[in-house]
From Swiss-Prot:
<dbReference type="InterPro" id="IPR000941">
    <property type="entry name" value="Enolase"/>
</dbReference>
<keyword id="KW-0479">Metal-binding</keyword>
<dbReference type="InterPro" id="IPR020811">
    <property type="entry name" value="Enolase_N"/>
</dbReference>
<feature type="binding site">
    <location>
        <position position="282"/>
    </location>
    <ligand>
        <name>Mg(2+)</name>
    </ligand>
</feature>
<dbReference type="GO" id="GO:0005576">
    <property type="term" value="C:extracellular region"/>
</dbReference>
<dbReference type="Pfam" id="PF00113">
    <property type="entry name" value="Enolase_C"/>
</dbReference>
<dbReference type="GO" id="GO:0004634">
    <property type="term" value="F:phosphopyruvate hydratase activity"/>
</dbReference>
<feature type="binding site">
    <location>
        <position position="385"/>
    </location>
    <ligand>
        <name>(2R)-2-phosphoglycerate</name>
    </ligand>
</feature>
<dbReference type="GO" id="GO:0009986">
    <property type="term" value="C:cell surface"/>
</dbReference>
<keyword id="KW-0324">Glycolysis</keyword>
<keyword id="KW-0963">Cytoplasm</keyword>
<keyword id="KW-0460">Magnesium</keyword>
<dbReference type="GO" id="GO:0000287">
    <property type="term" value="F:magnesium ion binding"/>
</dbReference>
<dbReference type="InterPro" id="IPR036849">
    <property type="entry name" value="Enolase-like_C_sf"/>
</dbReference>
<dbReference type="InterPro" id="IPR029017">
    <property type="entry name" value="Enolase-like_N"/>
</dbReference>
<comment type="pathway">
    <text>Carbohydrate degradation; glycolysis; pyruvate from D-glyceraldehyde 3-phosphate: step 4/5.</text>
</comment>
<feature type="binding site">
    <location>
        <position position="363"/>
    </location>
    <ligand>
        <name>(2R)-2-phosphoglycerate</name>
    </ligand>
</feature>
Length: 428
């Protein structure tokens, strides 16, 4: 039995230079694994709560308290448990914390232990992590949703939309999809230079030019797709993360300098669908605007994937309410929003059983940990969002997917355009 023997933790830095938690787990059979916890910039109010130190150190963002929680309380509680009983381990973590949002011990400390236990168990079983979590049929490689132009909370510009992504839906394999996306990324740099725009990078490795509008940004990316030798909507499609929480206040959306209602935002998105090959729109409205979300889904949900991030926060209870209300048709999956691997898998299972698509996602504050790459293949999500093909904390996930594709050999299947059944390349 892979019994947990030791649990350690330390404070490390994430990709934005902020502290985060790294956990190490050793099993009685000598197996060892570590996991690092990501952190978001634009966060939903219903997410699991991170335990931060406050005070002057690291601007209040230190995680010494979270590390102490692992060493003094969480570790001793799981030592002696069977690492390959993930549900039992995670339930012990949830019960130990005793709060609905993991605010006592911290979602960051709890998640670090949960993920490190899973990694150690997979090592003990001598199975790749994607196979350990997903079982013998895990073989679908996801479409990389590459955030090649950053705005919103991920960049210091006037662009309200947070992420402009390219999705290589026409590629024959993941490795080719990665190449296509990288070539579009480099073509975009040339397009921006020619237009006299900045080629500085945002938090997730995408370019962060100060463009005039959403449509101007989409036009630049469309030019880059064509300049790289691909056809927009056939080879490479577009996707957005509006992160509407960031421009919503007092019941109104201040978007591109104009106050708008939820209905007016819906009309705006519908107009984009008629002009650009968009396969996915994430967080188009404020997280608590259930009625607006339901109306938007009814209006355009048959033509585009509508992804719930802040509205669902990878929480099965929030997702179930959204399903009942007819909100969105896809779930964004972020392990640190809910705080354990088991709860993450439960949210994915609920989404799939309810006809919702899933997209596995990184956070803007990332580390070199690659578990989300394995998770995407394990659950067969068909989509992964982990930034631009730049910056090592982003590329690490893509490189892990290359390794998984190679390991699967002829059994590997790339999701491609089948990941977006609502999308029609030429609606006319």
């Amino acid at each position: 039995m892979p019994i947990i023997e030791q649990v350690g933790a330390r404070e490390i830095l994430d990709s934005r230079g902020n502290p985060t938690v790294e956990v190490e787990v050793a099993l009685i059979d000598g197996t060892f694994a570590r996991a690092a916890v990501p952190s978001g910039a634009s966060t939903g109010e219903h997410e699991a709560v991170e335990l931060r130190d406050g005070g002057d150190r690291y601007g209040g963002k230190g995680v010494k308290k979270a590390v102490e929680a692992v060493l003094d309380e969480i570790g001793p509680a799981v030592i002696g448990l069977n690492a390959d009983d993930q549900r039992l381990v995670d339930q012990a973590l949830v019960d130990l914390d005793g709060t609905p949002d993991k605010s006592r011990l911290g979602g960051n400390s709890i998640l670090g232990v949960s993920l490190a236990v899973a990694k150690a168990a997979s090592e003990s079983a001598e199975l790749p992590l994607f196979r350990y979590i997903g079982g013998p049929n895990a073989h679908i490689l996801p479409v990389p949703m590459m955030n090649i132009l950053n705005g919103g909370a991920h960049a210091d510009t006037g662009v309200d939309i947070q992420e402009f992504m390219v999705a290589p839906i026409g590629a024959p394999s993941f490795s080719e999809a990665l190449r296509w996306g990288a070539e579009v990324y480099h073509a975009l740099k040339a397009v921006l230079k020619k237009a006299g725009l900045s080629t500085g990078l945002g938090d997730e490795g995408g370019f962060a030019p100060d463009v005039a509008s959403t449509t101007a940004a989409l036009d630049l990316i469309s030019q880059a797709i064509e300049a790289a030798g691909f056809k927009p909507g056939v080879d490479v499609a577009l996707a957005l993360d509006a992160a509407a929480n960031e421009f919503h206040a007092d019941g109104s959306y201040t978007f591109e300098g104009t106050p708008r209602t939820a209905a007016q935002m819906t009309e705006f998105y519908a107009g984009l669908l008629g002009s650009y090959p968009l396969v996915s729109i994430e967080d188009p409205l404020y997280e608590n605007d259930w009625d607006g979300w339901a109306a938007l889904t009814a209006e355009i949900g048959d033509r585009v994937q509508i992804v719930g991030d802040d509205v669902f926060v990878t929480n099965p209870e929030r997702l179930e309410e959204g399903i009942d209300r007819g909100v969105a048709n896809a779930l964004l999956v972020k392990v640190n929003q809910i705080g354990t691997l088991t709860e993450t898998l439960d949210a994915v299972a609920l989404a799939h059983h309810s006809g919702y698509r899933t997209m596995i996602s990184h956070r803007s504050g990332e580390t070199e940990d690659t578990i989300i790459a394995d998770l995407a293949v394990a659950v067969g999500s068909g989509q992964i969002k982990t930034g631009a093909p730049a910056r090592s904390e982003r590329v690490a996930k893509y490189n892990q997917l290359l390794r998984i594709e190679e390991a699967l050999g002829d059994a590997a299947r790339y999701a491609g355009d089948l990941a977006f059944p609502r999308f029609v390349a030429d609606p006319k």
